[in-house]
Amino acid sequence: TPEMLGTLFEELITGRHEQGAYYTPAYVVSYMSKESIKRYLGANGILLSKDLIGTIDASNPYTGDAQQILELLKNVKIIDPACGSGAYLVGFVNEIMRLYCTLSPDADSHSIFAFKKHCVSKCIFGVDLEEYAVQIAQLRLWLSLISQAVDPMPLPHIDLNIVVGDSISGPNPGKHYLWPADQKSAL
């Protein structure tokens, strides 16, 4: 599973604390994903009670404009500037998909896969210093996507969204991190 791959990577990497590499526990990833979505929706006019995001499910359906939330989720952009093995990125996709499936109870497997593919290829971005960590993050997102594939179909170019770089201190901390021109145009 994508989670197992991340755990394995986190356990095998040596010297991570010397490099400032720390990995986020699953319960923190879940909380951060829900909070991020709640704040994003709130900034776009959808005010939800404190715990509503976490409690929207089949037994507690959302009674507002589900289509408006789905459209916002389709257009969200999330970046993890120190993504490591991609725990937050995968957690965010999982939370978006949990909400999508709850708000679209009649969605068929093709629609679910198409929405997830869109999220992975258009909404999720990450940067990390370690090439191996970036490769694991990409693989985790691909595995997450493949796990719901109904027909063999081309996978998105996640390698354009998850890149090796230093987005925190970079060569010049006064400048914003810029995606390479060839990758930026592909997005």
Predicted regions and their residues:
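Long recognition/docking surfaces used for binding and targeting
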Residues: 1-12
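SAM-dependent methyltransferase catalytic region
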Residues: 14, 18-187
